[in-house]
UniProtKB/Swiss-Prot annotation:
It comes from Bos taurus. InterPro entries: 6-blade_b-propeller_TolB-like, EGF-like_Ca-bd_dom, EGF-like_dom, EGF-type_Asp/Asn_hydroxyl_site, EGF_Ca-bd_CS, Growth_fac_rcpt_cys_sf, LDL_receptor-like_sf, LDLR-related. Residues 796-845 are cytoplasmic. One of its GO terms (biological process) is negative regulation of astrocyte activation. Glycans are attached at N659. Interacts (via NPXY motif) with DAB2 (via PID domain); the interaction is impaired by tyrosine phosphorylation of the NPXY motif. Interacts (via NPXY motif) with LDLRAP1 (via PID domain). Interacts with ARRB1. Interacts with SNX17. Interacts with the full-length immature form of PCSK9 (via C-terminus). Interacts with PGRMC1 and TMEM97; the interaction increases LDL internalization. Binds low density lipoprotein /LDL, the major cholesterol-carrying lipoprotein of plasma, and transports it into cells by endocytosis. In order to be internalized, the receptor-ligand complexes must first cluster into clathrin-coated pits. Forms a ternary complex with PGRMC1 and TMEM97 receptors which increases LDLR-mediated LDL internalization. Residues 1-21 form the signal peptide. CDD domains: EGF_CA, LDLa. The gene is LDLR. LDL-receptor class B repeats lie at residues 441-487, 488-530, 531-574, 575-619, 620-660. Belongs to the LDLR family. PROSITE patterns: ASX_HYDROXYL, EGF_2, EGF_3, EGF_CA, LDLRA_1, LDLRA_2, LDLRB. This is Low-density lipoprotein receptor.
Length: 845
């Protein structure tokens, strides 16, 4: 009997142990088990927010046992969080207790740098250059009066510029003295603005040289850099029965304080006092309209005209005692009636039921990834980023991020914490557009005065001999520039020609993709991962356009509430576009399909005339040509506006240089068996609209068309000769006349001589007169050959009938050369038949 009792006890103990083990094994390998049995991700343990209802994931005992992996830094303290080792002593506090910035040695500048009194390092050429580059101004303290060398011109402001820039029709001194008549005499005939007024009849010519819409002249909002569009304007006066808005416009007096803004600056609704409102926890609105204090309700004194403050049945009754009044979560008893409330993270649906709020529906809830939980949410980061414990923002891990920006005569480089600030490419004329290729460590820029696009290795950029001219002709105003880092192409806009063009990064092959009369394309950004490009256009009407990187499927993405769109950038991981509007003084964002539009920031002072912007982590950076400065702000909320650099000279484009901004992708033009995708000229990525979309299409230079095989190129004269019967051809816009001959590569393994369009056309013209005479010679010979071939086939057929054989069908060998190049059967390269010529002959020769 005693043995049976012991056996029963052992069995019960074993069952309990197995049950406990089963509970412990409920969670996966990468999960943490709360004390109540709930499983959460190990990434959420000791991150400052309790996911376990019992708080065991944030307890001191749990966090003490956390060990940081190699390369990480332990914050220590009660929470003991782990951060990236690269965040240690980076000038930004990441641990709650600030331990990551304790005991850090002062930053040391290199031998070829100047150290400001505040510890910032700048290039020595910035010292005593009349610009405050140190935030404390120490780089301009105790400077002697500057004297210019023999090869320089000294401006009236003592600034020195190269002598070649003086009297060239383009002001380079900050006071414009290099173009004053007393120095130059008559205007220089070869200046960039040979026409005294390059603006159209519908535009206003600013004194500083820009062209703006005529409707912006005298609208009480300066748009010119020198504010000349608001000079000598008549002052508007309003009638006695009108209200004058802060911008000077007049509206009828009855529209003031009507709860609907009628002034553009909303000044008609400022300072209004609404006496009819009855809101707040201590107010009660009678059914007869009066507003009384809540302490007068159910006090046996009738204060409302209709006695609605003293209902006999409701006063003194607590409806929450009966099944919580039907509320699913919280019932709050009121003096009259009751109300259902919801805990944080839930919302009331109807009058009684609470439902979880999906915070992740808002794209700005988290900086990158959002995980919705019951009653809460969790933010996570993309690969290459880690969640910062203090701010809950995603911070990049790895290389140092730099801002590259144009400063009229140079390109400068600056770290995000402003600890390093140097000149990257000096001695330029008028650099406007800028972009980089991180993998090759190369930078590209356009010069508005030289009307060229250049490139250089970033490490060797200061040496002028290392510059490469990528595009050196047929440019008028290359205002925007973008690099396709996957397919090694560059895209640029030309606001005077109204074009968007593409070329390989060597500049050997180029093509005009888009041209429209009246358009003024400005900034451009590319998404080579998905095959799209986006650009701003401040023509009439102003809009933001989207199209494929091969020039197809172009349409307007933003057409409303947009006036002067300038810079544009893409948050590739978040799938959102950001742009600045110089007329609306705003930064806005929208998803890549045109939805979920949001205004990030509106500020007439900090966004007086924004020109370009860049995005990284949770920050947006922008240049402003009127403030002559660079600012930053939180890209989700528009808060935390900071001054990054000031006292600049016409800062225009800005890009962020970091390896995470240009993720790797597949270059399908190089994945096929044929070189360059089998294309004779350009192989361009196609937009990935759906899973069946082509990976690329072939393109020909301006003035040439695709042949029937959709790979070879024909001149327009040849296509007219070889076309049989009527055909429908969708023409692409032809850009400016090229003087250089386009380089045509071979399709498949056929060697073709490289020749210009004129050579191809002239060859076709010289061969055409002798073709009729050749028919009299070739035709009889061809008939004899056909007769002999037919006789051979008859003999072979008779011979095969007398031979026994077994045949095996092999579908691989049944595939003909025609099948290989047929556009509908190719697994990689396709085209859009409705947009291409399909009636041309294959035989070009």
């Amino acid at each position: 009997m005693r043995l049976a009792g012991w056996g029963l006890r052992w069995a019960i103990a074993l069952l309990i142990a197995v049950g406990e083990a089963a509970v412990e094994d409920n969670c996966g390998r990468n999960e943490f088990q709360c004390q109540d049995g709930k499983c959460i991700s190990y990434k959420w343990v000791c991150d400052g927010t309790a996911e376990c209802q019992d708080g065991s994931d944030e307890s001191q005992e749990t966090c003490k046992s956390v060990t940081c992996k190699m390369g990480d830094f332990s914050c220590g303290g009660r929470v003991n969080r782990c951060i990236s080792g690269s965040w240690r002593c980076d000038g930004q506090v990441d641990c709650e207790n600030g331990s990551d910035e304790e005991g850090c040695s002062p930053k040391t500048c290199s031998q070829d740098e100047f150290r400001c009194n505040d510890g910032k390092c700048i290039a020595p050429k910035f010292v005593c250059d009349l610009d405050l580059d140190c935030l404390d101004g120490s780089d301009e303290a105790s400077c002697p009066m500057p004297t210019c060398g023999p090869a320089n011109f000294q401006c009236n402001s003592s600034m020195c510029i190269p002598q070649l820039w003086a009297c060239d029709g383009d002001p380079d001194c900050d006071d414009g003295s290099d173009e004053w008549p007393k120095h130059c005499g008559t205007p220089h005939p070869s200046g960039p603005l040979q026409d005294n007024n390059p603006c159209s009849a519908l535009e206003f010519h600013c004194g500083s040289g820009e062209c703006i819409h005529s409707s912006w002249h005298c609208d009480h909002d300066p748009d010119c850099k020198d504010k000349s569009d608001e000079e000598n304007c008549a002052v508007a006066t309003c009638r006695p029965d009108e209200f004058q808005c802060s911008d000077g416009t007049c509206i009828h007096g009855s529209r003031q304080c009507d709860r609907e803004p009628d002034c553009k600056d909303l000044s008609d609704e400022l300072g209004c006092v609404n006496v009819t409102l009855c809101e707040g926890p201590n107010k009660f609105k009678c059914q007869s309209g009066e507003c009384i204090s809540l302490d007068k309700v159910c006090n046996s004194v009738r204060d409302c005209r209709d006695w609605s403050d003293e209902p006999l049945k409701d006063c003194g009754t607590n409806e929450c005692l009966d099944n919580k009044g039907g509320c699913s979560h919280i019932c709050n008893d009121l003096k009259i009636g009751y109300e259902c409330l919801c805990p944080e993270g839930f919302q009331l649906v109807g009058k009684h039921r609470c439902e979880d709020i999906d915070e992740c529906q808002n794209p700005d809830t988290c900086s990158q990834l959002c995980v919705n939980l019951e009653g809460s949410y969790k933010c996570e980061c993309e690969e290459g980023f880690r969640l910062e414990p203090l701010t809950k923002a995603c911070k990049a891990v790895g290389t140092i991020a730099y801002l590259f920006f144009t400063n009229r005569h140079e390109v400068r480089k600056m770290t995000l914490d402003r600890s390093e600030y140097t000149s990257l490419i000096p001695n330029l004329k008028n650099v406007v557009a800028l972009d980089t290729e991180v993998a090759s460590n190369r930078i590209y820029w356009s010069d508005l005065s030289q009307r060229k696009i250049y490139s250089a290795q970033i490490d060797g950029a200061p040496g002028f001999s290392s510059y490469d001219t990528v595009i050196g002709e047929d440019l008028q105003a290359p205002d925007g520039l973008a690099v396709d880092w996957i397919h090694s192409n560059i895209y640029w806009t030309d606001s005077i020609l109204g074009t968007v063009s593409v070329a390989d990064t060597k500049g050997v092959k180029r093509k005009t993709l888009f041209q429209e009369e009246g358009s003024k394309p400005r900034a451009i950004v590319v998404d080579p991962v998905h095959g799209f490009m986006y650009w701003t256009d401040w023509g009439a009407p102003a809009e933001i356009k989207k199209g494929g990187l091969n020039g197809v499927d172009v349409y307007s993405l933003v057409t409303e509430d947009i006036q002067w769109p300038n810079g544009i950038t893409l948050d590739l991981s978040g799938g959102r576009l950001y742009w600045v509007d110089s007329k609306l003084h705003s930064i806005s964002s929208i998803d890549v399909n045109g939805g979920n539009r949001k205004t990030v920031l509106e500020d007439k002072k900090k966004l007086a005339h924004p020109f370009s912007l860049a995005i990284f982590e949770d920050k947006v950076f922008w240049t402003d040509v009127i403030n002559e400065a660079i600012f930053s702000a939180n890209r989700l909320t528009g808060s935390d506006i900071s001054l990054m650099a000031e006292n600049l000279l016409s800062p225009e484009d800005i890009v962020l240089f970091h390896n995470l901004t240009q993720p790797r992708g597949v270059n399908w033009c190089e994945r096929t068996a044929l070189r360059n995708g089998g294309c004779q000229y350009l192989c361009l990525p196609a937009p990935q609209i759906n899973p069946r979309s082509p990976k690329f299409t072939c393109a020909c230079p301006d003035g040439m068309l695709l042949a029937k095989d959709m790979r070879s190129c024909l001149t327009e004269s040849e296509s007219a000769v070889t076309t049989r019967g009527p055909s429908t051809v969708s023409s692409t816009a032809v850009g400016p006349k090229r003087t250089a001959s386009p380089e045509l590569t071979t399709a498949e393994s056929v060697t073709m001589s490289q020749q210009g369009q004129g050579d191809i056309a002239s060859q076709a013209d010289t061969e055409r007169p002798g073709s009729v005479g050749a028919l009299y010679i070739v035709l009889p010979i061809a008939l004899l050959i056909l007769l002999a071939f037919g006789t051979f086939l008859l003999w072979k057929n008779w011979r095969l009938k007398s031979i026994n054989s077994i045949n095996f069908d092999n579908p691989v060998y049944q595939k003909t050369t025609e099948d290989e190049v047929h556009i509908c059967r190719s697994q990689d390269g396709y085209t859009y038949p409705s947009r291409q010529m399909v009636s041309l002959e294959d035989d070009v020769a």
